[in-house]
């Protein structure tokens, strides 16, 4: 039995009605006609069923970070109107919903993909371009902008995707980060980017907004993080402003 599963969870500034979390997954509706309307109906049914917190499929923070060149982002007023359909539908059933921000890095199916180092993914025909120091700060700015847009759209929070080989995880893992500057080398340098993203997002959205950090507990590849390093990162992103750590 799970005696705490259906008990409320107090986050300090808001309370989840239970600890049931619907994890992020792509519905295939993000880029189709009437996609926002259909996603609103889809997520509303989950809220109606009593899920405490819903996380959407990944929304790209910029064009180079999307899963493919036509990935939906949250930029225009039209985008905001579409996403408000989703948040309004979930809130009508007393649900809470966070939008996942997914930067795919070298997993992007696009010749414009970027990463910490120019190391080709085994699942992708394209080789990423290694980011300059200035461009890394631009990526952080895009995470922040998208988080603020999500807040404007009525989301209760965002999930920052930092696991499973995607962009932030590519900086963390030594096998995909061969930089010799302040963003590479030591583990402290390699986790600098996700910490800075969380810190900057928290600074921008204020205290009364959920920030979930998606953390890889186990990389399952050579050159991945050790258990001690994962714990170190978890503590660091919590200190930087994460409300919830999701694995």
Annotated model-derived regions:
Residues 11-12, 19-37:
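N-terminal binding-site loop/beta-alpha segment at the start of enzyme catalytic domains
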Residues 1-21, 90, 199-206:
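N-terminal amphipathic alpha-helix/helix-capping segment at the start of soluble metabolic enzymes
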Residues 30-36, 40-49, 53, 60-84, ...:
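Alpha/beta enzyme core
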Residues 16-17, 57-61:
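A broad, low-specificity signal for short, low-complexity segments enriched in glycine/proline
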